[in-house]
From Swiss-Prot:
Protein name: NADPH-dependent oxidoreductase
Source superkingdom: Bacteria
Gene field: nfrA
GO molecular function terms listed in the Swiss-Prot or TrEMBL record: oxidoreductase activity
Leading EC class: oxidoreductase
Task performed by this protein: Reduces FMN, organic nitro compounds and disulfide DTNB. Involved in maintenance of the cellular redox state and the disulfide stress response.
């Protein structure tokens, strides 16, 4: 049995430095088609992909994200939850489907659809020799992103993805993930606190050593410290408001 795909995904790491070489239209089309082949709940296909090569639009999105590689890449994708076409079906059929796509379940379906599509694109791009980085930073200002991209009601930007040929001096590497036993629960969830704390202590040591080696001693924080810093940062607290402004989560 070939382990090509297994080895490919195990090597994944975010690439944040790209060569100044735009992706061809053919490559973009192949990536999108690969994304479309992802599983989709009840065949709703509740997503859309916005491809961006306009430098002014990229720059506007960079101002939202604060990250240079939103501009400096081979191509930029933005993935959105999309119930606009479903809304049009609803209007044409004169039914009341908004109870479904304006629900919390509808939000989950759209977000999962978009994520599955994006992961297909990521794996396909890496198989072609490109690097990718996901961009949750576009949610820093959802209202501005909706304005920049002319998003109608029932469409919500969830994340972006920069794709391109890695720069010659790009030196990223796969970070050690939580060990198998930490994330795989057999038959039922195992919530024993002592076990969980022991596992996290081991993983904290692994991550601290990883950063120490990667930075020649300049960085040594643990995974737990990163979590405390990230989740303790009161950011993007307007998500519910922005979702509701988009016509989602009405009930």
């Amino acid at each position: 049995m070939s382990e090509h795909v297994y080895n490919l995904v195990k090597k994944h790491h975010s690439v944040r430095k790209f060569k100044n070489k735009p992706l061809s239209e053919d490559v973009v089309k192949k990536l999108v088609e690969a994304g479309q082949s992802a599983s989709t709940s009840s065949f709703l296909q509740a997503y859309s992909i916005i491809g961006i090569d306009d430098e002014k639009i990229k720059e506007n999105l960079r101002e939202v994200s604060g990250q240079p590689y939103v501009v400096e890449n081979g191509y930029l994708f933005v993935f959105v939850i999309d119930y606009y076409r479903h809304h049009l079906v609803d209007q044409h059929a004169e039914t009341d489907m908004e109870n479904a796509y304006g629900s919390t379940e509808g939000l989950l379906v759209g977000a999962i659809d978009a994520a599955l599509v994006a992961e297909n694109i990521a794996v396909t791009a890496e198989d072609m020799g490109y690097g990718i980085v996901f961009l949750g930073s576009l949610r820093n200002d959802v209202e501005r992103v909706r304005e920049i991209l002319d998003l109608p009601d029932y469409v919500f930007p969830v994340f972006g993805m920069a794709v391109g040929e890695p720069a010659d001096d790009e030196n990223g590497a796969a970070k050690p993930r939580l060990p198998f036993d930490h994330v795989f629960h057999h038959n039922k969830y195992h919530a024993d606190k002592e076990t969980q704390y022991a596992q996290m202590a081991d993983y904290d040591q692994t991550i601290s050593e990883y950063y120490d080696q990667r930075t020649n001693g300049n960085r040594k924080e643990t995974w737990s410290q990163q979590i405390e810093m990230f989740l303790g940062n009161k950011a993007r607290l307007d998500m519910l408001e922005q979702l509701q402004k988009s016509g989602l989560i009405q009930r």
